Every structure is written in C-alpha cells, then in structure tokens.
C-alpha cells in the first residue's frame, strides 16, 4: 500500500501547469468508440482512471497508443468485442460510458455494474432509461447491464428527472448515431459536457446547446476521425488555488480557463484572497493573510462544484470564523472531516451539512484518504500542519491528479511517496 509522507508547514508558491481534465478525457475516450476512423487526442492526463479506460477500450478491440509527446491515438475501426468486463469496470464508475457508444454503433453492448469512489449512491438508472427511450432493450443479468437494439436507435425527447453529468453524456453520445433528433431537457451544463460535444462535432456529429439545460442532437449515419485537445482541469486548478490560500502563498495556474471556475473564484475572493485572471492563467495571492470563513452549497454547474467541497472544507477549518458547507449532490461526502479533526480541526457533521469552526493551525497526524477529492484535502492539510503527516490509501489521488507530488514539490512542498509491505 502506497502512502504520502508530508513534512510541514510551508508556504506553497510558484507556477503550476494544469493538466487536461479527467472528467472530459474519460467520456471523450469512450466516445471515440463511435468513430469509424482513427482520432488523435492531446492534453490527455496521465492518470490511473485513464489507464483503466485504455484497458477497457483494448478489451473491445480498440487500438490505443500514446506517443512520446503524450498524444493518444485511438482506432476503433476494428472493434470485435462488446463487453466491458468486471475486473476492469469494478475500479471505475465511469466505465458505464462504454455502453452508449457500443449500442449506438454496433447495436449491442454489455458493461459490468461499475465501481469507483464510495461516496453515496450513484445509480446508473438514468443512463439506462435514456437509452430505453431511444429504443434500446436493457437487461440486468449477473451483474451486467446488457443493451441491444434492432437497428439504429431513434431520436427521443428525454427529460432528466435530476441533473446528471453522467447520464447527459451517455444520452448525448448515443444520440449522435440515432435516427432523427434527440432533445435532452434539464441537461447538465458542465464544461466537460461542452468539451465532449466539441469532440463529437469534430467527428461529424450535429450537437447544439451543450452548456445550456437543453441539448439538441440531430443523428448522423457515421462519425469520422478528428483531432481534439482535452479542456484544462478546472478542479485541479481550483485545488492549487486553495493550496495558495491555505498556506499563505501565491500560485499561478497556467493553461486553464477562469470561465469554467467562476463560482470557486467568487468564493476565494469572498475569503479575502486576491485572484487575477488572464486568457489562460489564474493567479491567487493570499498576501500571507489567513482566509476568512465562507459558506458553501454545492450545486450543479454553474453552481459551486461538489468536487471542490473537500478542498474548501480544509480552507474553512483554518479560516477566521465559522462556516457551513452543505452537500446537495452526493451522500456520504464528508468522510474527510473526521480525518481533518485528527489534525486539530473542529468540524461537525449534521446530515448533509458540515459546520467548520476555524482554528489557526493544524498538527500532523496519520490520516486515511477515503475518496479522490478527500485525499487531496488531506495532503494539503499535511502541507500546512506542523510535523510529519502520513496520508494512507493514496491510490485515490492517482485516479484524478497527474504527477501530484512533482507538482507540489515544484511549489515548495516536502512530500514523498513510500510503500508499506504489510497491512495489519
């Protein structure tokens, strides 16, 4: 089991090059299954979940190659297998995105019920119901979701009972090759959906309205090859901005877009931080000041992102004042608070709300990561705590942060990865 050892405290300052967004790269990689010709993707992050996606695609018969520059070539022209198996899918819930492209292009597909972070219920029902409305026949058999269709799927009006990024992406992918027009109402509006639509349109799809709550897709008979650059990771950007805020530092995030992170930037300014933006950079200068407590309520985009909640929990436990953080997207997403409390934080959980009473300093401790975003908040807590902090179960962090210890060392952190052979 790998762990991080962090020797704090220190100020985090410098420049960070932001990686491509995992939450765009994964659906785009699966969407490449729709194309009859090779596609080339750049700015694809080097992450465990991306590697898992490569393995799933190869199981389907897709040729996947990453060259020395980091560009990824995908050739799905000779797919000969239509099952995404349990041994790969169990580690990553995003695997459900394999289903829609398979049934849209080949009229059959099977995906094991997915795994991933354990942060509450993440049902695949909305993915399934969307495909059913487009004419797919769905069976649940021995832990697999099986989808078949008698010829091409057909266009449909699909209203999302709940705003869902995953289901919006599934329906949008399937609709590109459907006969007729599909309308998705109450669609998710995240930047990663916009990026996936740009990729699909580059292959010849006819999608309009991505980034609004109504997306219209006019089906085409086939999709062809293209080149596409994955959008910058807004969550990684926000994470490094928080790193500067909690450590009294100044960090510039390079190769990113402020318009994908407006709610986070607004809250950082409310916390007393100076944030300046250019076309492709965001800089946070704390001026050595302790942040002020800010209330947070997670919401679908363009609201405050749930994937920044854990980082702002850390900000609030070291801020001046008391704050309330309400989580409306996922259940069970405050598992980092007991771990932060081991480091001297004063956090309480009341249902879907956390109450944070700010303290001036944290102290080192041994803590355990419970999910992807919780893990980075604990690593950053170690950066500002006095002494040596050990963060266990860091495999979570490798799922979503590219070369994280190298990037942290580049802005002043003392962090090392080490392995333990035995677990009690």
From Swiss-Prot:
UniProt KW keywords: Cell cycle, Cell division, Cell shape, Cell wall biogenesis/degradation, Cytoplasm, Peptidoglycan synthesis, Pyruvate, Transferase
Binding locations of phosphoenolpyruvate: 22-23
Positions annotated as active site in the UniProt record: 117
Broad class of enzyme this protein falls into: transferase
BP GO annotations: cell division; cell wall organization; peptidoglycan biosynthetic process; regulation of cell shape; UDP-N-acetylgalactosamine biosynthetic process
Binding annotation for UDP-N-acetyl-alpha-D-glucosamine: 93, 162-165, 307, 329
GO molecular function terms listed in the Swiss-Prot or TrEMBL record: UDP-N-acetylglucosamine 1-carboxyvinyltransferase activity
Pathway membership: Cell wall biogenesis; peptidoglycan biosynthesis
Family named by the database record: Belongs to the EPSP synthase family. MurA subfamily.
The protein's name in its UniProt record: UDP-N-acetylglucosamine 1-carboxyvinyltransferase
The organism of origin for this protein: Actinobacillus pleuropneumoniae serotype 5b (strain L20)
